[in-house]
């Protein structure tokens, strides 16, 4: 749709003042905060520090991912981001319910190749697609870790994601950890929005499921 038609429709529905504020905010997110928060890399010094950190308990985190007709580039990016974590005691449980045979063969081949290189990766082909909730449960059934982490098949983790989660577990006895998230327009360099999650509030949670991904419990 033409951008001007979209703006006109937005003005009609919400008014000029709200529309102007929305445009300014989106530009601020995209062109300033997007550049500030987007980098998915860390310095070698930070990486060494995080990799050498020794928690009181070296807890295994099981990252569960339901796959469904996942694009190859998204799958590779997700897989690489998990393998690039500075905290290494994790396992990746992939439950594939794809109904396109060509896509499923591609995912299975990539997963098996990754398994040969990294024994922390587990893959299972599901015969029935039961929807994202039950497919996630099938991935959870594969897990052996003390904590479960929910991740989508088109998500990307920052290299420090599990390290930061472990900080919350180790120093604050966190039982349920949820994180801020960035939305991308196809590639990580194009930030669409940044979701800064609030502190836990039952009242807010009843109207807005703000925990979602990345969540660990």
Which residues fall in each region the model found?
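Acidic donor-binding segment of Leloir-type glycosyltransferases
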Residues: 83-128
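Glycine-rich, basic loop-to-helix element that forms the pyrophosphate-binding segment
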Residues: 126-143
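The conserved acidic donor/metal-binding loop of glycosyltransferases
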Residues: 152-156, 180
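Short alpha-helix within the catalytic core of nucleotide-sugar-dependent glycosyltransferases
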Residues: 79-80, 137, 145, 158-171
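A recurrent flexible, glycine/aromatic-enriched loop bordering the glycosyltransferase active site
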Residues: 133, 141, 190-217
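Short aromatic/hydrophobic "clamp" motif used to bind/position activated sugar donors
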Residues: 148
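N-proximal low-complexity "stem/linker" segments adjacent to membrane-targeting elements
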Residues: 9-81
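Conserved donor NDP-sugar-binding/catalytic core segment of glycosyltransferases
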Residues: 160-191
């Amino acid at each position: 749709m033409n951008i001007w038609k979209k703006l006109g429709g937005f003005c009609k529905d919400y008014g000029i003042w709200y529309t102007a504020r929305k445009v300014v905010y989106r530009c601020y997110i995209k062109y300033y905060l997007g550049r500030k928060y987007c980098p998915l890399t860390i310095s070698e010094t930070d990486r060494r520090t995080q990799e050498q950190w020794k928690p009181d308990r070296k807890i295994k985190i099981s990252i569960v991912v339901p796959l469904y007709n996942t694009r190859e580039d998204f799958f590779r990016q997700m897989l690489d981001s998990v393998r690039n974590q500075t905290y290494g005691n994790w396992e990746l449980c992939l439950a594939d319910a794809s109904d396109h045979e060509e896509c499923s063969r591609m995912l299975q081949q990539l997963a098996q190749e990754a398994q040969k290189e990294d024994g922390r990766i587990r893959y299972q082909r599901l015969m029935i697609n039961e929807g994202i909730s039950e497919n996630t449960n099938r991935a959870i059934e594969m897990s052996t870790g003390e904590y479960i982490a929910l991740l989508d098949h088109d998500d990307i983790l920052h290299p420090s994601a599990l390290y930061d989660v472990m900080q919350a577990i180790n120093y604050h006895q966190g039982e349920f950890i949820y994180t801020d998230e960035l939305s991308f327009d196809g590639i990580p360099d194009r930030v669409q929005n940044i979701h800064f999650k609030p502190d836990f509030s039952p009242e807010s949670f009843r109207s807005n499921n703000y925990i979602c991904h990345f969540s660990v419990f």
